[in-house]
Amino acid sequence: MPIRITGGLMRGRNVPSPDTSKTRPTASRTREALFNILQGVEGFRVLDLFAGTGIMGIEALSRGASHVVVVEMAHAQARLVLQAYKSLSLESKLTLFEKNALSLDKDSLCATEGFDLIYADPPFKDMDYPDLRPYWEWLNPGGVAVFEAPSRNLPAWVKEADEAGTVQVRRYGESSLVIYRA
């Protein structure tokens, strides 16, 4: 079932999505809300972790981001992401790593520049939700990290960071966006 791009120059175009219950693309309502919160991503370097369909990176490019680094460990999904970027003539703005996002370090991404936006959507139905705070160190000054987490069972580290005022949590049905600003 195709996924529709919600904004920017490619608004209304479709991205392929696999017919499987293992992939849970970010809902269009959540994507629109996120980019409204960000209020512009022009020129951003984006890191899309646990990319799945790759829709978040594509949305960012459609809205003016300059480059996206995609990390997806499932071979079939990584191929689908590459196909989607090629179908939209975006492959020159893509660096794709077929790796487990949890075993990455910044050096392995050749990312000496850092990132302006980091988006992570771990498969939280299949695993314990990981502590993603170490990725905050990969942000450029003024950068934003956004992690999609289960609304019904927010991880303890998210609750602690929310109570401390370190992050902002926005709920959208079954998913919540955990937003950290560097």
Locations of regions flagged by a protein language model:
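Class I S-adenosyl-L-methionine-dependent methyltransferase catalytic core
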Residues: M1-A182
